[in-house]
Amino acid sequence: MTREDATAEILAARLARGLSWQQLAEAIDRPLVWTISALLGQHPVPVESAEILVELLGLDQSAVPVLAAVPMRGGLPTAVPTDPTIYRFYEVLQVYGGAIKELIHEEFGDGIMSAINFSVDVERKPHPDGDRVVVTFDGKFLPYAWTAADGRR
């Protein structure tokens, strides 16, 4: 079984069993967005959690080691995403990425926001003109530092 096979089986089983992502996240006591991302193939799932998920979803036990394996992260099928929801994030970063980068540098200095020491949250916010989607990225600041192999800076 490949990771892609496991993901396809997870998606089909979740719908067939009427399970929400929230129910799956609660079953393994993990954050909702992390759980979804993991089940879509972007994080390794601890074996104990994978066993719970496989049982809930009615998958073959051969899915456990596949879910627990360290995945190839960040791969999208095309260079520019074509799914409208995912493309909006691409578009947001095209329009606001430079401004966000400048603000990070002004506030923190020369560095980046980690996507490894990181969490993301998605919330719904009522608004008179239509509900809003609030996405919060919470990443550790990592300063750029030149360090030579011999420890000199």
From Swiss-Prot:
<dbReference type="GO" id="GO:0009439">
    <property type="term" value="P:cyanate metabolic process"/>
</dbReference>
<feature type="active site">
    <location>
        <position position="91"/>
    </location>
</feature>
<comment type="function">
    <text>Catalyzes the reaction of cyanate with bicarbonate to produce ammonia and carbon dioxide.</text>
</comment>
<dbReference type="GO" id="GO:0008824">
    <property type="term" value="F:cyanate hydratase activity"/>
</dbReference>
<feature type="active site">
    <location>
        <position position="114"/>
    </location>
</feature>
<dbReference type="InterPro" id="IPR048564">
    <property type="entry name" value="CYNS_N"/>
</dbReference>
<dbReference type="GO" id="GO:0003677">
    <property type="term" value="F:DNA binding"/>
</dbReference>
<protein>
    <recommendedName>
        <fullName>Cyanate hydratase</fullName>
        <ecNumber>4.2.1.104</ecNumber>
    </recommendedName>
</protein>
<dbReference type="InterPro" id="IPR036581">
    <property type="entry name" value="Cyanate_lyase_C_sf"/>
</dbReference>
<keyword id="KW-0456">Lyase</keyword>
<dbReference type="Pfam" id="PF02560">
    <property type="entry name" value="Cyanate_lyase"/>
</dbReference>
<dbReference type="Pfam" id="PF21291">
    <property type="entry name" value="CYNS_N"/>
</dbReference>
<dbReference type="InterPro" id="IPR003712">
    <property type="entry name" value="Cyanate_lyase_C"/>
</dbReference>
<comment type="similarity">
    <text>Belongs to the cyanase family.</text>
</comment>
<dbReference type="InterPro" id="IPR008076">
    <property type="entry name" value="Cyanase"/>
</dbReference>
<feature type="active site">
    <location>
        <position position="88"/>
    </location>
</feature>
<dbReference type="InterPro" id="IPR010982">
    <property type="entry name" value="Lambda_DNA-bd_dom_sf"/>
</dbReference>
